Amino acid sequence: MLGLLAKITTISFPGLGIGEFEVNKIAVSADKLAFLKKIFGENWGGIAWYGVIIMIGIVLAALYGMSRAKIEGISSDDILDVILVAVIVSVIGARVYYVVFYGGYDSLYDLVAVWNGGLAIYGAVIGGIISLIIMSKIKKVPALRLLDIGASSIILGQAIGRWGNFVNAEAYGYETTLPWRMGIGSGANAIFVHPTFLYESLWNIVGFVLIWSLYKKKKYDGQMFFIYLAWYGFGRMLIEGLRTDSLWLVPYVIRVSQLIGAVCFVICTAILVLMEIKQRKAAKNGCNN
């Protein structure tokens, strides 16, 4: 990954006919919000687009989750409580996962400044699953039903959130000459890489549409959750192989995210197949009776 510290990055997609343009990482500069420096400290650079985009993803995912919960017969008050807890725990989980595996922070401010980047989706998923299971017990709602709602919501949030990586000039892939290559830098200093953030965003959009279309045909609680993990795991396993900022489990053999993705894909696909067989046997026995 290209570790760019500048607030403005020059981007291009020459193979698609899109010339060089500048992307500013800061949505609102600290100079315009000087009073907030008393809260966040002198090192605070302003409101970053990364944080804005992540927040948009969270809000849209929450709104979709609330609409889906209504269809599932879960009260608005209950699902709102669930969402608030899930969002907080997911963000904490995403940050903890990132800090544990990547580290490199010199101050408490840098450690908690999630608005500047540094969130790991697997940490968010783990935190979200744990919070949903706990809240299902508190609200007396089937855990797998909540996980179905959460899965269909989080994949939408992921699709949007990946664009935070775009403005932060991070999570890119190896250099390539493919027509859809993305240029980073200007003129002779530019390098052309796989836009892996875009690959994952598009993959998640397709996954969201798939889950949305299958939801009305859902046969049992947990089905959408397992489809989500299988779909995302498979896509992440492939896309991660193109990234240059991965955490290696075995150097130059397999990455941590690839292994997690592969495990999710294999286990959840097996569960889906076994449940389908079980459903068909039950239907056949019902017809015979």
Features from the language model and the residues they span:
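A feature for loop-to-transmembrane-helix boundaries and adjacent hydrophobic helices
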Residues: 1-289
